[in-house]
A protein has these predicted regions:
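Bacterial N-terminal signal peptides that target proteins for export
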Residues: 2-13
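N-terminal non-cleavable signal-anchor helices
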Residues: 7-9, 18, 169
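Short, well-structured hydrophobic secondary-structure segments
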Residues: 67-74
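Intrinsically disordered, low-complexity terminal tails and linkers in eukaryotic proteins, enriched
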Residues: 24-66, 87-198
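Bacterial N-terminal signal peptides
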Residues: 12-23
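Beta-edge loop/turn motif
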Residues: 74-77, 125
Length: 198
């Protein structure tokens, strides 16, 4: 009986790994009815730029770009997107910008964002955005480098497993980032005396 269990163990491990990898994506997408690869959780990518806020797109007004679906509030936004999609596609495949400098692909809610030099960055929370803004330019440079050299074409689960196991040298925990925020700006929810540029 023990021999059977031992011989089954590698197969069970393989099945577990395959189950974990199933559904992995190189982009942060969700499934919503007829749109199994929905970007930005259905928010209009153009509205972040033109309205300065996250706005849910109409499921009837949509476009495909690089294998994913984007929804729009109106046809004019869809046309703007289709004319220059690179202007509106979110940085880092729609994953959280605060994970990018650590070569991590963290999920986002799509409502917390910042536009820097015309580029859309998304965050999982206001706190992660605040931490990222402390060293915004460095975080963009690191995030861009890791995205192109390592994370862009890797599925998020194996990538995150790898980088949580083998962290980049400059990795900081949320607690360390919050302590740095407090050291620089005071209490946790205080706005900085001088807002980071961007």
């Amino acid at each position: 009986m023990i021999m059977k269990i031992v011989s089954i163990a590698p197969r069970l491990l393989l099945l577990t790994v395959l189950a974990l990898l199933a559904g992995c994506s190189t982009l942060n997408v969700v499934s919503d009815g007829a749109d199994p690869q929905l970007m930005l959780r259905g928010n209009d990518p153009v509205a972040y730029h033109t309205l300065g806020k996250a706005v849910a797109g109409d499921p009837q007004i949509k476009a495909q770009h690089e294998g994913v679906t984007y929804r729009f509030t109106n046809a004019a936004h869809r046309d703007l997107f289709l004319a220059t999609p690179q202007r509106y596609v979110p940085a880092y495949g729609g994953f959280c910008a605060s994970g990018a400098p650590y070569a991590l692909k963290a999920n986002i809610g799509a409502n917390t964002f910042k536009i820097v030099d015309g580029r859309l960055y998304l965050f999982g929370s206001a706190r992660s955005r605040r931490h990222w803004e402390m060293d915004q330019q460095q975080n963009i440079a690191l995030g861009d480098r890791y995205w192109e050299q390592e994370t862009k074409d890797r599925s998020f689960r194996p990538q995150n497993w790898y980088r949580y196991t083998f962290r980049v040298a400059h990795y900081k925990t949320d607690a360390e980032l919050e302590a740095e925020w407090q050291r620089r700006y005071g209490k946790p929810d205080a706005a900085p005396a001088k807002a980071p540029a961007g």
